[in-house]
Amino acid sequence: MDPEDRSEIAFFDVETTVPKRGQRFAILEFGSILVCPKKLTELRSYTTLVQPADLSLISSLSVRCNGIKRDDVVLAPLFADIADTVYDILHGRIWAGHNILRFDCARIREAFAEIGRQPPEPKGAIDSLGLLTQKFGRRAGDMKMATLARYFGLGNQTHRSLDDVRMNLEVLKYCATVLFLESSLPYAHVDNSVSPETISSRRRIDASREGNTVTTSVRLPSISENSAAQPDPFNMSVLRNEMASDNHIQSDILMEEEQIEPSDVVASENTSDHEGFLTPDAMSLSNIKAMLFPFYPGSQMMKLKLLHGDSPLQLYCSYLKIRFGVNGKFLDNTGRRRLNFVVDLNPSLYSILEACDSNAQKLSVDSGSTSEWNPVVNPMKGFVNYPNARIHIATEINGDEARYATEIHQRESSGATQKLIFSNPNNEELESLLTTGSVVDAFLSLEPYDYQQKAGIRLVAKKLVIQS
């Protein structure tokens, strides 16, 4: 192969820190393989750890995501030291990777900008996330690399750059083979909606299902300087139209107005009945997982949910001390009061929320989101020297009227509990009850959101028991 034609496909992946609010990504590892476009064989590989300019960016959350610790990179080269090699590998070649258009390409451009150099430019791009979503569909469940690899029995994803790009190539080979066979055997198709738990099942679907042919001539679009913020180059119009028309998505600013989904488990008025809710001490960190589910049956739009085992992750937290109470001076865009308060977290609850945050953020990034992640646990700063989190009181809108969707009870010193009835959420009744220093028992739902480039988990109270 002529070394000057640069016809090889450059599969690449970067491992990065997981930034907190206001921080930037920092590359911790770069890995790439050059692949022959005619034989799909690996011709050359390169990988290296990268020392970030600021080692403090490597947080415990970052280590949980990719296993790269500060000690691993303290003697590694800076990005400036490997920039020539990275440029030579990438410039003028077709780039390939999983979610590279929204993530890896942006990180490469940022890294070159930080050292004052022009970034490499591709002559085309293959983003396997967009390509496989369109061509292969969600028959494996979600479109995470780890899920696709498990579907084909390729082992576990290590979240290390060179391993991931090699796995990416193998996944593409397997998917292409399946699509080729389907196009050749139109009467023997597999179900396109099989979940990871049932991928061993063999099902038949209507032979007239669309999307079973392989396009053998796909023009690879070049990427402009701002490509990281542009749509995927593949035809995702159906998904985009669905996003535009979907009425389930609500603004994070208007989170208090969201409707309670019928499937949500709500605690009964008997405070001894905690069915569906677990205390933090009763939960196992290894059983916490984040998964993608359709917004509604048949939808291509996916929403992220948190599970404990196979059940929705819902918490019962007793004796939470309120650090900052409800403050009526903060309003949402409709003029209604924002109903939330901040509580201190005990160590077990803190660990659970950190694990939820880590799992949800990783899935959010892996599924293609570029939104800024808002941690569920508020950072400790200034005089606030204890981990804390914000709890939201849900409201329901019925015409022009609003009412609390959160059940609110009050426990007297005698132990008797009564349900409180409020006229509407626009008055100041809660301000006198949920004050700084008071104590509540809370039944909490953890609800991930991703809207207007903001993503995170909000703690929504299904039921509150205020201690007198």
Swiss-Prot record:
GO molecular function, one term: nucleic acid binding
Binding, Mg(2+) 1: 13, 15, 164
Lineage: Eukaryota, Viridiplantae, Streptophyta, Embryophyta, Tracheophyta
Induction record: Regulated by the transcription factors NAC045 and NAC086.
Presence of the UniProt keyword Nuclease in the record: yes
UniProt-listed Pfam families: RNase_T
Alphabetical UniProt keywords: Cytoplasm, Exonuclease, Hydrolase, Magnesium, Metal-binding, Nuclease, Nucleus
Compartment(s) of residence: Cytoplasm; Nucleus
Free-text tissue specificity from the UniProt record: Expressed in the sieve elements and phloem pole pericycle cells.
PANTHER family in the record: DNA POLYMERASE III SUBUNIT EPSILON, PROTEIN NEN1
Name this polypeptide is given: Protein NEN1
E.C. code: 3.1.11.-
Function description: Probable exonuclease involved in enuclation of sieve elements.
Known cofactor(s): Mg(2+)
Domain Exonuclease intervals: 11-172
Binding of Mg(2+) 2, residues: 13
Entry's Gene Ontology cellular component terms: cytoplasm; nucleus
Provenance organism: Arabidopsis thaliana (Mouse-ear cress)
UniProt-annotated catalytic positions: 159
